[in-house]
Amino acid sequence: MGSLSRQAFFQELGSGCLLPTVQQGLEQVWQLLLICLVCRLSWRLGLPNFLKHLSTVVGGFYTLYLFFELHMVWVVLLSLLCYLILFLCRHSSSRGPFLSITILIYLLLGELHMMDTTTWHKMRGSQMVVAMKAVSLAFDLDKGIVDKVPSPVEFMGYIYFVGTVIFGPWISFNSYMDAVESRKLSVSWFMKSVISCVKSQLCLLISNCVAPYLFPYFIPVFGNKLLRKWLQAYENSLSFHFSNYFVSFLGETTTTLAGAGFTEEKDNLKWDMTIAKPLYVEFPRSMVEVVTSWNLPMSRWLNTYVFRKALRYGSFTAIIMTYTASALLHGLSFHIGAVLLTLGFITYIEHVLRKRLSAILNACVLSKRCPSDCKHRHKKELWVYLINGTFSMLALLHLTYLGSDFRPQDGVASHTIQKWTQLSWTSHWLTFALWVFYRLIL
Amino acid sequence: MTEYRNFLLLFITSLSVIYPCTGISWLGLTINGSSVGWNQTHHCKLLDGLVPDQQQLCKRNLELMHSIVRAARLTKSACTSSFSDMRWNWSSIESAPHFTPDLAKGTREAAFVVSLAAAVVSHAIARACASGDLPSCSCAAMPSEQAAPDFRWGGCGDNLRYYGLQMGSAFSDAPMRNRRSGPQDFRLMQLHNNAVGRQVLMDSLEMKCKCHGVSGSCSVKTCWKGLQDISTISADLKSKYLSATKVIPRQIGTRRQLVPREMEVRPVGENELVYLVSSPDYCTQNAKQGSLGTTDRQCNKTASGSESCGLMCCGRGYNAYTEVLVERCQCKYHWCCYVSCKTCKRTVERYVSK
């Protein structure tokens, strides 16, 4: 009497997990998808812009209610607060920093005082998207990228854009205004929506039904006690990854369906919104690549509105501030904060080490892939591949370590510490060793 | 008062001898139950293990019997693996439907086996239902009680609640609703332990839920039935066995109830296994107590728990011998999809109690 036989397991998996997961995955989002589509179609009716903004506000409110019920008032409050600040500071040139601080205070108060953890946790994603939109708008106003404070209906349309209000991603105000112009319906637009939707459901299935049972049912690797700990950590990590991809592809679906997420070059329109690049995360070149591939719009946002503005204080400080900002956007979770801060150190040390190695060895071993016309002497030698391969394996190990304990609902600090202790603080020690090595070759 | 208790205990013992326990007699179905096709009603009378009520149930639900035979087999194997490190020799379960005193009386061991059997039979019926083997049941309707506002029902996973438990309960409780099965106290004990077993089964089949949302928030939650082994249930019941409560009968109002023997201020918990008769230490062979003794039982020299040689051998010491194991090693996975292994020999030292 041991575990289920392989055949019995797969039978059980089909009826007990695959079917319920698909059913629930679609059941919870079909209304959102429908509203996105209706909004898109109505924008094609030649309505005046005022009504277009209004229709997406209505759609956005309705979807917020669908997902969060009356708790949506907190999202509404946040957006009203943001507009108030923008309006009151309309003659100022420091709207960006001021609005950022205001939002930070609001989120901290919400986290600490306003309501129970479960409810706040549920809405955190939407709060984060609203915060990012408002901050980006404020900074763009400061720089003149957006030439005047938008009207209330424009602002609310942007904030509550039905394509991004629940699952993101962040899009810039100008992208939103482009979307309002309403491009023609086309086969490529429809295919993009459908394909992203299918991908999201696939990722949901992998997250729920494949990753947790990867070893030994799908891949017959058993291993001893130590290896089993790492295999289990990898399973947890993979499950978390694919949960993220599910949300990312779902965000692509809703955004495209609602009419945003395209690029235009000389009358050549492409529906090419990309939020996450799973292959770059699961088969990483470096942790830097992982970090940017995890959520491209968020990477862009952090780079534009945090990293570059903090660069005047030095690159290390800028990186740490970027990860701190990311952690704060994710809410006051010790676990997420610890993971992101650790990630910050890992990426920084890897980046500077590889940069140094690249200079010393005159080889293509940087964190990011070299363009084909780079001036390094060594590009395709075996030892170059070996070095890059080693860093890839390291990245895989870091990912397993950092993702080994993602149960977002319990933010207990001791649990994170306990999990990392079980894995002997491997990533921390390795990162420290690499830093020592880096100092030695300076 | 002590005399009254002694008299009552003697009375119960006498009755148990006169009317052998039949609460889990159906475990005897493993002997020849699998050779019967279970497609004619007269098959229900061919076997020793069923009491009249169970025979009636059998005739009305012939398609259930394959599941019940399988449950009997599973119960025995789960019992075997759970108690391999204990002094009590589980082999007496093989003598079903006729039991030796360690299971025929209201002992702690009987409490464990009874509750495990109740859990496993419900589990087996539920799984047969879910896999479509039972035409008499179908997917459960949406439950009226919602686990949470955002909980969404998903599929046939909950057949256990409505069909498995109901039919399992009807089957395993049937003998105890018959006065001839033994004194009322004994029957109350069995019914209670059956309920505990089913509750453990219910608890182990909780839905697993997972959150999905931007950066791990909980905008979407999906739930599915977790895959469960009988060994999980068995392990849970074993820990309840280790903390089981000895009870005595007591008249409370117009009803007879079982209350803890020691602290008489509290009622018996719904999740507690209960027993009436204390068990022997099972160290030496004693047919009257159903104790086979621990002589020649394997023990673990390096362990410190119940399987350790010190405890298993009851201080009598142990003998060592060597055994050559032939096992698979250097297994390799070939894409796609098979594993090939070499054969290795390994010598291990074994210890058995004197």
UniProtKB/Swiss-Prot annotation, chain B:
Residues 1-23 form the signal peptide. Glycans are attached at residues 32, 39, 89, 300. PROSITE patterns: WNT1. GO terms for molecular function: cytokine activity; frizzled binding; protein heterodimerization activity. The keyword Oxidoreductase does not apply. InterPro entries: Wnt, Wnt_C, Wnt_CS. Palmitoleoylation is required for efficient binding to frizzled receptors. Depalmitoleoylation leads to Wnt signaling pathway inhibition. A lipid is attached at residue 215 (O-palmitoleoyl serine). One of its GO terms (cellular component) is plasma membrane. It is found in: Secreted, Extracellular space, Extracellular matrix. Pfam families: wnt. Keywords: Developmental protein, Disulfide bond, Extracellular matrix, Glycoprotein, Lipoprotein, Secreted, Signal, Wnt signaling pathway. GO terms for biological process: camera-type eye development; canonical Wnt signaling pathway; cell fate commitment; cell migration; cell migration involved in gastrulation; cell-cell adhesion; central nervous system development; convergent extension. It comes from the Eukaryota. Belongs to the Wnt family. Ligand for fzd5, a member of the G-protein coupled frizzled receptor family. Plays a role in early eye development, possibly through wnt non-canonical signaling. Promotes eye formation, at least partially, by antagonizing the Wnt/beta-catenin pathway. In addition, promotes coherence of eye field cells, potentially contributing to the coordinated morphogenetic behaviors of cells in the nascent eye field. This is Protein Wnt-11. It comes from Danio rerio. The gene is wnt11.
